[in-house]
């Protein structure tokens, strides 16, 4: 039995300076991290007779030890608090379940700059525009820019080794700076400047310069050039007319909040240079009994102050909640950014409309999320009843994909009580079996997955085997032979076979390979969750197989050529910009690749042609 925490003795040792505290349970796990302007005063509040909430009561009941870190300032304490939350993921803290850095558009500092998507640290020389809410928004913008301003987007390894322009040049989406004489340095630099102005929100300057160039071209009787610039002007105008634009200098993050049934949604609207770049909804993990104020305060702190997130701080943050520590947050963000950051909770005019939009989006996203969660919960409850299990907290499903026995890939997808856990999806490359032997493939993937130590929380309640009796027999055989420290009898093995016509709703389920199967009604919620996880597993397996097949397809031709090993294959593909570029190259161009002689270049050329 663990000793009772001696709060009185502990509080006598605590200072009244600012700092951070970490609370531990009997197992030595950090269960809560907090900050305080006055550590003694804040920590004393936990041990009063009348606590503020049940959540605090439950927390205090588990405390076995408290560590304190004193800081110079309250700002230091705030930064340290969020780094500790990130490190320990305490169960009584509100946790932001998002660890992705945001993507930017990168304009390189090369002689002929290129456009690309970028995530992570900004080490490369060049300019960064953003952040954008996701990769899709960046790719859409890059595709749009390519149509209006024909600046290259190819990798430098491709750009440096071209002797003829690529397809992008042929269709007018690149000026072809890789080949001398196709475009002047001045013209390319001008298009790069247009991109820079456009991404900075200075559309009017772009239009003014383009109009002046069009008029000059007309005066010089260069009508084809004037027509090309006219088309560019029209394209820029079409884009700017569709934009939701505020004041040209607006550089804001707008944060709306919705809270219902113990779940919170925080919706962030990203506005840069007056343009809405996009938005994103977050669903932080909220311990029971948490107040909305704590949710918002913790989310904002974690969102901006955790160093690994690579956030770009805007000049102003609009919040849909009046924080108690608003001044402290603004000071901490300003210190982090090296410039003044304003935090507003009661904006007017356009800013108030932005905040209303973020609030509406948060409410809509929360309703959708609650509906989805309710549906998956109902389906899992129904499946647990069918399988005579008390509950299903974790379920895993396996599928095999190949083409005529080649490039075999197995997939494992994971569902928990909230649905798909995509971060835990896995693919396994299958090797050393007879091509096309699905049973051997299933045997191999199950041994690799379960023939090792597994955390208690990650032992599945149900393992679904796609393929019917034969595959289920393999699973039973594997589990019978497993020698592992965890309870291998806990997972229920369930086989699922498609119906005679392979139509959804006609599936047959098996508990035993030699037993009779059973079917569920097509409208059964239990069947729907089985179909959901099976389809996820199928798609995941096919995706992995296609990638593997494409990789083999791109290198298999070269592998048959004598004298071309892995290093030379890699060098050829790198310098020629891929297999297609190599197929189109002449003998002389191939011979310029390091490590390729004239004789070998001729052999490669004729092998690829015939």
UniProtKB/Swiss-Prot annotation:
| A cellular-component GO term for this protein | excinuclease repair complex
Q: Does the keyword DNA damage apply?
A: yes
Q: Domain of life of the organism in this record?
A: Bacteria
Task: Kindly list the places in or outside the cell where this protein is found, as annotated in its UniProt entry.
Answer: Cytoplasm
Q: Where would I find the UVR domain in this sequence?
A: 204-239
Keyword DNA repair listed? The answer is: yes
| Pfam families (UniProt xref) | GIY-YIG (PF01541), HHH_5 (PF14520), UVR (PF02151), UvrC_RNaseH (PF22920), UvrC_RNaseH_dom (PF08459)
Keywords linked to the UniProt accession: Cytoplasm, DNA damage, DNA excision, DNA repair, Excision nuclease, SOS response
> Which terms in the Gene Ontology molecular function aspect does this entry carry?
DNA binding; excinuclease ABC activity
Enumerate the Gene3D superfamilies for this protein.
Answer: 5' to 3' exonuclease, C-terminal subdomain (1.10.150.20), GIY-YIG endonuclease (3.40.1440.10), UVR domain (4.10.860.10), UvrC, RNAse H endonuclease domain (3.30.420.340)
Classification via SMART domains: GIYc, HhH1
- Describe the location of the GIY-YIG domain by residue ranges: 16-94
The free-text function statement in the UniProt record for this protein reads:
The UvrABC repair system catalyzes the recognition and processing of DNA lesions. UvrC both incises the 5' and 3' sides of the lesion. The N-terminal half is responsible for the 3' incision and the C-terminal half is responsible for the 5' incision.
What this protein is called in its record is UvrABC system protein C
Q: Please report the organism this UniProt entry assigns to the protein.
A: Salmonella dublin (strain CT_02021853)
């Amino acid at each position: 039995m663990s000793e009772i925490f001696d709060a009185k003795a502990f509080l006598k040792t605590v200072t009244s300076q600012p700092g951070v505290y970490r609370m531990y349970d009997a197992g030595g796990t950090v269960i809560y991290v907090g900050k305080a302007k006055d550590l003694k005063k804040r920590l004393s509040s936990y041990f009063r007779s009348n606590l503020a909430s049940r959540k605090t009561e439950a927390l205090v009941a588990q405390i076995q030890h408290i560590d304190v870190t004193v800081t110079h300032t309250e700002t230091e304490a705030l930064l340290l608090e969020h780094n500790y939350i990130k490190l320990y993921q305490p169960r009584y803290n509100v946790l932001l379940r998002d660890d992705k850095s945001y993507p930017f558009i990168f304009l390189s500092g090369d002689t002929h700059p290129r456009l690309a998507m970028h995530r992570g640290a900004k080490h490369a020389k060049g300019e960064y525009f953003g952040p954008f809410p996701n990769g899709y928004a960046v790719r859409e913008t890059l595709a749009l820019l390519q149509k209006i301003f024909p600046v290259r987007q190819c990798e430098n390894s491709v750009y440096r080794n071209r002797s003829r322009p690529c397809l992008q040049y042929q269709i007018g989406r690149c000026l072809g700076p890789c080949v001398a004489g196709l475009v002047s340095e001045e013209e390319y630099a001008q298009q790069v400047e247009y991109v820079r102005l456009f991404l900075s929100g200075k559309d009017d300057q772009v239009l003014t310069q383009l109009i002046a160039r069009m008029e000059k071209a007309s005066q010089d009787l260069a009508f084809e050039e004037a027509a090309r610039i006219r088309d560019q002007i029209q394209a820029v105008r079409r884009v700017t007319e569709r934009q939701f634009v505020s004041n040209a200098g607006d550089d804001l993050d707008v944060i709306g909040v919705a809270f219902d049934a113990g779940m919170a949604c925080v919706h962030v609207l990203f506005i840069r240079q007056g343009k809405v770049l996009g938005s994103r909804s977050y669903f932080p993990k909220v311990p029971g009994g948490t107040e909305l104020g704590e949710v918002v305060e913790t989310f904002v702190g974690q969102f901006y102050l955790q160093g690994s997130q690579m956030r770009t701080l805007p000049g102003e943050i609009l919040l849909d909640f009046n924080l108690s520590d608003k001044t402290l947050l603004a000071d901490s963000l300003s210190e982090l950014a090296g410039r003044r950051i304003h935090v507003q909770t009661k904006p007017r005019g356009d800013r108030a409309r932005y905040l209303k939009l973020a609030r509406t989006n948060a409410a809509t996203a929360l309703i959708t999320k609650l509906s989805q969660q309710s549906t998956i919960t109902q389906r899992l409850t129904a499946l647990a009843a069918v399988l005579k299990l008390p509950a299903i907290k974790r379920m895993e499903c396996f599928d095999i994909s190949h083409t005529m026995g080649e490039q075999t890939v197995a997939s494992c997808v994971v569902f928990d009580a909230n649905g798909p856990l995509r971060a835990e999806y896995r693919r396994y490359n299958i090797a050393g079996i007879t091509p096309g032997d699905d049973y051997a493939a299933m045997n191999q993937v199950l041994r690799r997955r379960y023939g090792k130590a597994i955390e208690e929380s990650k032992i599945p309640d149900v393992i679904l085997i796609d393929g019917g009796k034969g595959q289920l027999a393999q699973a039973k055989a594997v589990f019978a032979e497993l020698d592992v420290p965890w309870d291998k009898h806990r997972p229920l093995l369930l086989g699922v076979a498609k119906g005679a016509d392979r139509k959804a709703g006609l599936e047959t389920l098996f508990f035993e390979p030699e037993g009779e199967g059973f079917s569920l009604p097509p409208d059964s919620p239990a069947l729907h969750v089985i179909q959901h996880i099976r389809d996820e597993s199928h798609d995941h397996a096919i995706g992995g197989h296609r990638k593997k097949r494409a990789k083999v397809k791109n290198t298999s031709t070269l592998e048959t050529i004598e004298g071309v090993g892995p290093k030379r294959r890699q060098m050829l593909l790198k310098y020629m910009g891929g297999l297609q570029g190599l197929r189109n190259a002449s003998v002389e161009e191939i011979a310029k690749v390091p490590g390729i002689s004239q004789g070998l270049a001729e052999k490669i050329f004729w092998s690829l042609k015939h």
